[in-house]
Amino acid sequence: MRTASPDTPAPRAPGVFALPFRVYYEDTDAGGIVYHANYLRWMERVRTEWLRTLGVQQTDLAAQQGLQFVVSELDIRYVKPARLDDLLTVDLTVDQVRGASLRLGQRVWQTSPLTQDRVDASARPLVEASVRVAVMNRQDGRPAALPRWLLNAMESS
């Protein structure tokens, strides 16, 4: 699945970062629905693009500060399948900030191809996830504090 426009985030509301995606044949399983692991790939892309909007290039963070983000916990619920050619929006909210980690809420919604709004505004998301992302020191693999400048960027976004 490719983003409809990877450089154009589509925020839904204050505090929500979102990107559009379309389901391609390569994203589906033999039953014609999105293969479960593909939702995780799309969520990772949204986290990466969200960090970019905060001024974080993960390669620079690793090279210059020796830090990297790792998923340390994941709780996911598959509510309803997405299918070939569906237009989706994957969003992200920051639910909790701790010294060395973030808990992010991520959801996948079916959206209208005409307006990119949800097909059914009252519907539950197709997929709901809670993702704990920890900051890790690349040299020793131990947890590291979230950099102050990153906390400031999150607060002002």
Language model regions located:
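Hot-dog-fold acyl-thioester-processing enzymes
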Residues: R2-V71, N137-S157
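Short coil/loop residues immediately preceding or within conserved phosphate-binding loops
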Residues: V71-E73, R103
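HotDog/MaoC-like acyl-thioester-processing domains
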Residues: R2-P11, L19, Y78-L87, D95-S157
